[in-house]
Regions:
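C-terminal cap of metal-dependent C-N hydrolases
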Residues: 9, 323-372
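Divalent-metal coordination cores built from histidine and acidic residues
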Residues: 74-156
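A conserved glycine-rich beta-strand in the N-terminal activation segment of trypsin-fold
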Residues: 16-24
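A structural motif
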Residues: 55, 81, 150, 260-262, ...
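Active-site core of metal-dependent hydrolases
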Residues: 155-276
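Conserved, mostly hydrophobic/aromatic
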Residues: 48, 80, 153, 206, ...
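His/Asp/Glu-enriched, well-ordered alpha-helical/loop segment
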Residues: 250-331
């Protein structure tokens, strides 16, 4: 006897779409295809709806030690997100106070900020990225202590933090010494973004790829900087990191015209961005990408199988035996509009509207509009 059967769904398994049903038993995916509904304690009819692996947000702020952090129970579960990466909110001095030892309602991993206090001062003043201030021995100790929770180092390279590329070069060195990756915030840097990309290697993450302030991935002629392309060829990964203020439709269109799409679709949602018209949630970020021309399956991969592979989450795919982390969406068209950091507004020609979230076989959120 199955615990739950989702029938008549449009399934996305982390790679492709197909029609069928999915059964859950004891917190795991028990069958995919056409399991018999009479063998289920609960049957949920998903006719006209899309069922995906629980989404994975590659760039969120939820550590709980800075002013910008959102509650993952609010920022994730109502939007089909069952796992997320905190993008550097905690430093070596605050990590153990934040939640690496605390039970979360979602699967969680953390980038450790190179700065000791992380983002705890962010709304008052920018963090100090001077490498002379980093507590490298303490950072190394934390990576030894929390190998499953920590997935890399984080540094911000906006002009408010750094005047030259030395901090990112030193952060790369430190990351390599720890056998980990570096995520670099590249939004309105003091130097060409290509100079930062030049320093990154395989597995490192360049976030805020499509931001439109100052120096970015586009050259003056509107083409993607060759150094950015070369970085991708070396295995550097590119994240959206939307946050509304870090996403310009015009930049995305130009890059997409050259086939330069993101590897991951991180929302960069914060306490103020959550439910705000700009970023709102991860499904809204995915909806923007598809509306702007990204293939639907490719966009969903950037929030399921791809971040699962990059960060080592167990989910991201529909497969028998996997944890039943699932999301159900209605795909809508012509409902409202999207805005970007420059104030451009476009019609929402594609909108992922959440209907249900399951975490390890338990229904943890359900839309009141859809009783199943």
């Amino acid at each position: 006897m199955f615990d739950t059967l989702f029938k008549n769904a449009r399934l996305f398994d982390g790679e492709r779409f197909f029609s069928g049903s999915l059964a859950v038993k004891a917190g795991k995916i028990a069958a995919i295809g056409d399991p018999a509904p009479e063998n289920a304690a609960q049957v949920i009819d998903c006719a006209g709806l899309t069922l995906t692996p629980g989404l994975i947000d590659a760039h969120l702020h939820f550590a709980g030690v800075s002013e910008i952090d959102a509650d993952p129970a609010l920022a994730c579960l109502p939007y089909g997100v069952t796992a997320a990466v905190d993008a550097g909110g905690a430093g070596e001095n605050t990590l153990e106070a934040c939640g690496v030892l605390r039970r979360r309602p979602i699967g969680a991993k953390y980038f450790l900020n190179v700065c000791s206090a992380g983002f705890s001062s962010l709304r008052a003043y920018p963090e100090n990225v001077d490498p002379a201030r980093w507590q490298e021995d303490r950072i190394a100790l934390l990576f030894e202590r929390y190998p499953e929770a920590l997935c890399g180092l984080k540094i911000r390279m906006g002009r408010e933090c750094a005047a030259d590329t030395r901090p990112v070069a030193e952060a790369v060195r430190l990351a390599r010494s720890l056998s980990t990756r570096l995520m670099v915030h590249v939004s309105d840097p003091a130097m060409p973004a290509g100079e930062i990309a030049d320093l990154l290697g395989e597995g490192d993450i360049f976030t805020h790829t499509y931001q439109g302030r100052g120096n970015g991935i586009l050259l003056a002629d509107g083409t993607v900087d060759p150094r950015v392309r070369e970085a991708r060829e070396r295995g550097v990964l590119f994240d959206v990191g939307d946050a509304h203020v870090h996403f310009a439709f015009s930049v995305f269109r130009r890059a997409a015209g050259e086939g330069f799409f993101p590897d991951t679709a991180g929302s960069d949602v914060t306490d103020r961005g959550l439910c705000a018209p700009g970023a709102f949630s991860l499904p809204v970020v995915l909806s923007k990408l598809v509306t702007l021309g990204m293939d639907e399956a490719a966009a969903l991969r950037a929030a399921t199988s791809r971040p699962a592979e990059i960060f080592g989450f167990s989910g991201g795919r529909l497969r028998v035996g996997a944890d039943a982390d699932l999301a159900v969406f209605a795909v809508l068209s012509g409902v409202g509009s999207f805005t970007d950091s420059a104030g451009e507004r476009i019609p929402a020609n594609y909108l992922l509207s959440p209907r249900l979230t399951m975490r390890r076989g338990a229904l943890v959120w359900r839309s009141v509009e859809w009783m199943g």
